[in-house]
């Protein structure tokens, strides 16, 4: 059987050597269950896809408030203050491109069937992070066209909202001690002091 599985959005582009680079990294790091490469927009701008485990406020600010109002919150949530040229152990890696160790998937479980698109990546990354390292690896890169269907389509927005509600119902809305502990540890490791 396969050692690794790749789950990716249809709007992802990458060079053939990307998969080999990620597999080599995973082969050398048996404690890593999931890895995400550096992600760029087609115009070369970086996508900030390393994130803290979200609070309800993080997702509301990010989705519904004007960018300027949520700037400080977004910088912290998306770890924009950190060096995106360095490897990091991140609890929430974007679902746009998930490179997963099959053995780890068997241990933590597959995608939770309650989530159909949106929220499933947060849930799986979190479960994986509890038992394995979940690494951002800038030694490989991809291009994500970022179609952002839930920003353009009312039906997709409603699915997004429903699944985020399901995520918080599963893990906790405001009183999630595990989230608080994981996020505090990561911010400390990244020397966040604002």
Feature names for model-found ranges:
Residues 13-49:
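Conserved donor NDP-sugar-binding/catalytic core segment of glycosyltransferases
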Residues 54-90:
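Short, flexible, basic/aromatic active-site loop/helix in glycosyltransferases
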């Amino acid at each position: 059987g396969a050692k690794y599985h790749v789950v990716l959005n249809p709007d992802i582009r990458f060079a053939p050597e990307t998969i080999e680079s990620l597999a080599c990294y995973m082969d050398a790091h048996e404690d890593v269950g999931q890895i995400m490469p550096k992600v760029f927009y087609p115009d070369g701008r970086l996508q900030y896809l390393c994130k803290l485990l979200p609070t309800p406020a993080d997702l509301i600010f990010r989705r519904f408030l004007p960018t300027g109002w949520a700037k400080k919150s977004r910088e912290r949530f998306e770890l924009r203050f950190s060096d995106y040229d360095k490897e990091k152990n991140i609890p929430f890696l974007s679902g746009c491109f998930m490179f997963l160790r099959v053995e780890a998937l068997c241990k933590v479980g597959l995608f939770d069937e309650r989530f159909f698109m949106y929220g499933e990546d947060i849930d799986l990354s979190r479960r994986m992070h509890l038992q394995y390292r979940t690494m951002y690896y800038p030694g490989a890169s991809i291009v994500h066209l970022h179609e952002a269907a839930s920003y353009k389509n009312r039906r997709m927005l409603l699915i997004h909202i429903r699944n985020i509600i399901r995520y918080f119902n599963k893990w906790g809305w405001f009183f999630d001690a595990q989230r608080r502990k994981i996020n505090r540890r990561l911010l400390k490791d990244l020397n966040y002091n604002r």
